[in-house]
Design a protein with these regions (language model features):
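Single-stranded RNA-binding surfaces
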Residues: 1-195
């Protein structure tokens, strides 16, 4: 049986461990004084492009500018006149002072700024909406194959916008199409408010 152990004896630190028998599955230590930005979405401005690093630095309001590597650039930023097998660099996709929406993937650590992405993901109760990544559709691999097939049909019936990806979370198992549709509509409204 899995157990969750919570240690909150120190006012500035919270420790949570998940165990099964004598095996530690997960350990999370949260410092209350630290500002957590992971998962947050910000409107930022490209402050510097570093082709040698294949990355850009983005001012999104934190103490240090965030680090945006080329692999985290959403397809919408790639040049439209792409030729077969043509390779791009970060300077082909972004310009200095360009405003972009970014999501924090990793919080600041030491002297390094936060790791950022433009491939946004919005998590709902049953679904995850990928508003600028149409190829990121799927169903949680934790579900059995029979349930996955049922959910696949339900997701297709949702008629999500073609440019957006939808992933069904494990919590979506056994949910009726109305609940999934409600979750999708909520996430679409959140995305609309962000943009």
């Amino acid at each position: 049986m899995k157990r969750m152990l919570i240690n909150a004896t120190q006012p500035e630190e919270l420790r949570i461990a998940v165990t099964e028998g004598n095996t530690l599955f997960d350990l999370d230590i949260e410092n209350i004084a630290e500002i957590r930005r992971k998962g947050n979405i910000y409107k930022g401005r490209v402050s510097r492009i570093e082709p040698s690093l294949g990355a850009a630095f983005v001012d999104f309001g934190a103490e240090r500018h965030g680090f945006l590597p080329f692999k985290e650039i959403a397809p919408q930023f790639l040049p439209k006149n792409k030729k077969n097998n043509e390779r791009f660099s970060i300077k082909d996709c972004l310009t200095k002072d360009q405003e972009i929406i970014v999501q924090v993937e990793k919080d600041e650590r030491g002297s390094k700024g936060a790791a950022l992405t433009t491939i946004i993901s919005l998590a709902g109760r049953f679904l995850v909406l990928m508003p600028n990544n149409s190829r990121a559709s799927g169903i949680s691999r934790r579900l059995d194959p029979v349930e996955r097939e049922k959910l696949k049909a339900k997701v297709e019936a949702l008629n999500a916008p073609k440019e957006m990806g939808v992933i069904v979370r494990t919590a979506g198992e056994g949910k009726d199409p109305e609940e999934l549709k409600w979750d999708l509509q909520y996430l679409l409204k959140v995305w609309d408010a962000i943009t």
